[in-house]
Amino acid sequence: SYSMEHFRWGKPVGKKRRPVKVYPNGAEDESAEAFPLEF
């Protein structure tokens, strides 16, 4: 499910995912995948 969202929010959410990684939650997994998309 997040696959399609990544492509859609990969750019706008990419910036918000960076700070989200600070959370000890599973957000790190989401931010880690958003990084390669932007990089």
Curated annotation (Swiss-Prot):
One of its GO terms (biological process) is regulation of corticosterone secretion. One of its GO terms (molecular function) is hormone activity. It comes from the Eukaryota. GO terms for cellular component: extracellular space; secretory granule. It is found in: Secreted. The modification Phosphoserine is found at residue 31. The keyword Acetylation applies. Keywords: Acetylation, Amidation, Cleavage on pair of basic residues, Hormone, Phosphoprotein, Secreted. The modification Valine amide is found at residue 13. The modification N-acetylserine is found at residue 1. Its main location: secreted. Precursor protein for pituitary hormones that regulate stress and environmental adaptation. This is Pro-opiomelanocortin.
